Amino acid sequence: MRVIVLGSGVIGVASAYYLAQQGAHVTVLDRQTGPAEETSFGNAGQISPGYSTPWAAPGIPFKAVKWMFQHHAPLAINLDGSMWQLQWMAQMLKNCNPQSYSQNKERMMRVAEYSRDCLKSLRETTGISYENRAKGTLQVFRKEAQLEAVQRDIEVLQECGVSYELLYQDDLARVEPALEHAKDKLVGGLHLPNDETGDCYLFTNALAQKAKELGVNFQFNQNVEGLVVEGDEIKGVRVNGQVLKADRYVLAFGSYSRDFLKPLALNLPVYPVKGYSLTIPIVQPEFAPQSTVLDETYKIAITRFDQRIRVGGMAELSGFNLGLNQDRRATLEMVTQDLFPGGNMAEASFWTGLRPMTPDSTPIIGATRFKNLFLNTGHGTLGWTMACGSGKLISDIVLSHQTEISTEGLSLQRYSTAA
């Protein structure tokens, strides 16, 4: 079977790898010069199934109003002039209730936990390396109210069978020794020992090489213009003025998937949520993290690679604007220096990317009303966490194999738009 995968971020490359592993003849098309050149390039580096939590949660509307008046707020809304931005925010608000939150979190954790298993198996069979560590994730709290509120998350973790440890101030340095100097600023934390870290860019490029060894044909610097449609079937992809044909097609264009599907009258509820990161060389290892530390107050992740610290976070609703906002950099620097001042900030690189976010925070993985078009997008901030599981899942769906986990609630059909 011939399959064309559109997109070479971590989701597209994982899809291509698992399709080829199961015998498909795969071609990957992308406008970029190589794999993982956009959203997968500079993300926070955490692989955290236990923190697969919907942004649409009870209390978020009230918090969003508060954040509008804070200098170092984790969320910023800049109207982009589109009706779609307002519609997307309205859909998200509809999910800010306990019932929707629980349903969405179950779906997210289902994919994320499966993805961790797939990644582990991939490492064992291929020996793939990407500055990876398996030392868990530590969420730290600066306020007693945060420590008290985490009980709701603990209940969900218990229901899902996720290992955790609730820590108090004097326990934090046992997990992250460099926090000893900063413990007076913190009241406690939640440690998930089974979470992992790694450089998504390195991983995606290494996996692309392994996909090539399975016969995957990567075509970069391509102007992918659109799909050729006949009835309920895709007949080809228009690329550089020509038409490339396959038996089945997988769309993994991230935030750009929605506009790509507009000519097909498929209303894909994916909005680009802008995030930022700093990559900082380590000069004092004793003041650097061992794994990932999440600052609950500022919603920022600080992750250890080999000789670098990756600091990522923020959520900015501003359309497809890729400008680097220096106020966001100031926030990332402030939080890093406050907790882990072991890096050379003068040599840090500043980056931004667009996360493809759905209103319910759950990715869109599955078929459409076109019998040979499939979607693998909308992973938001969890593309790295969910990549391998999403790739394996879509490969099974495309090839009509029995999936290893339930696909309930993952396809476009969960929205009112015809899929």
UniProtKB/Swiss-Prot annotation:
Disulfide bonds: none annotated. Pathway: Amino-acid degradation; D-alanine degradation; NH(3) and pyruvate from D-alanine: step 1/1. GO terms for biological process: D-alanine catabolic process. It catalyses: a D-alpha-amino acid + A + H2O = a 2-oxocarboxylate + AH2 + NH4(+). SUPFAM superfamilies: FAD-linked reductases, C-terminal domain (SSF54373), FAD/NAD(P)-binding domain (SSF51905). Its cofactor is FAD. Pfam families: DAO. Its EC number is 1.4.99.-. GO terms for molecular function: D-amino-acid dehydrogenase activity. GO terms for cellular component: cytoplasm; plasma membrane. InterPro entries: DadA, FAD-dep_OxRdtase, FAD/NAD-bd_sf. FAD binds at residues 3-17. Keywords: FAD, Flavoprotein, Oxidoreductase. Oxidative deamination of D-amino acids. Belongs to the DadA oxidoreductase family. This is D-amino acid dehydrogenase. The gene is dadA.
